[in-house]
């Protein structure tokens, strides 16, 4: 990244990243404004499974919010629900750990209450992702589920979700 002239930014819980709008002007990112907020891990967090040290990021742009938790398990989800509660509510959820049965707990989904969820996984992958029980929890929450194995690329643009260039 450095050779390509890309800035590297190390973040942890409580840090935020400003979002530039289309005009190039910057907004100040904080808990109330547009930006990306890191919810986890903090400098003192530890885990036996390195997947549980993935960044958990919440994106807010004024019209839209989404949460991205990498490969965290239900154990980290539980910590976050206990800490943030209703503040976790979002429009969009990128399913943790490719829709693994070890993530996407009922309490997590209830706290997020997403309208859309994206599951990133290949068809017929060796892990069996996504797990039926994880998808059932999303369906029980009346969440529209998008799968990259069916739709390919999923994009967010101007407060809309697009599957492979279809809204």
Predicted regions and their residues:
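Non-globular, low-confidence helical/coil segments that flank catalytic cores
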Residues: 1-167
């Amino acid at each position: 990244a450095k050779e390509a002239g890309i800035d590297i930014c190390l973040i942890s819980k409580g840090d935020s990243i400003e979002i530039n709008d289309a005009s190039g002007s910057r907004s100040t990112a904080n808990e109330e404004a547009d930006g990306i907020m890191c919810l986890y891990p903090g400098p003192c967090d530890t885990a036996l499974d390195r997947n549980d040290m993935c960044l958990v990021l919440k994106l807010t742009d004024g019209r839209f919010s989404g949460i991205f938790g990498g490969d965290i398990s239900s154990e980290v989800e539980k910590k976050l629900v206990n800490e943030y509660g209703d503040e976790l509510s979002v429009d969009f959820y990128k399913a943790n750990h490719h829709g693994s049965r070890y993530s996407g707990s009922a309490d997590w989904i209830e706290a997020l209450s997403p309208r859309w969820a994206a599951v990133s996984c290949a068809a017929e992958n060796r892990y069996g992702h996504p797990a039926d029980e994880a998808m059932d929890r999303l369906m029980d929450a009346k969440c529209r589920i998008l799968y990259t194995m069916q739709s390919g690329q999923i994009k967010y643009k101007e407060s809309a979700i697009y599957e492979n260039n279809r809204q």
